[in-house]
UniProtKB/Swiss-Prot annotation:
Gene Ontology terms: cellular component: extracellular region
Cysteine disulfide partners in this protein: none
Keywords of the record: Amidation, Disulfide bond, Gamma-carboxyglutamic acid, Secreted, Toxin
Main localization (coarse): secreted
Subcellular location: Secreted
4-carboxyglutamate carried by residues: 7
Domain statement: The cysteine framework is V (CC-CC).
Post-translational modification remark: Contains 2 disulfide bonds that can be either 'C1-C3, C2-C4' or 'C1-C4, C2-C3', since these disulfide connectivities have been observed for conotoxins with cysteine framework V (for examples, see AC P0DQQ7 and AC P81755).
Tissue expression as described in the entry: Expressed by the venom duct.
Identification of the protein by name: Conotoxin tx5h
Signal peptide: none
Length: 12
C-alpha cells in the first residue's frame, strides 16, 4: 500500500 487507501491510481 503506497497510500492510506488502496487505490489503483495511488501508485500508478
Amino acid at each position: 500500500n503506497c497510500c492510506p487507501i488502496d487505490e489503483e491510481s495511488c501508485c500508478s
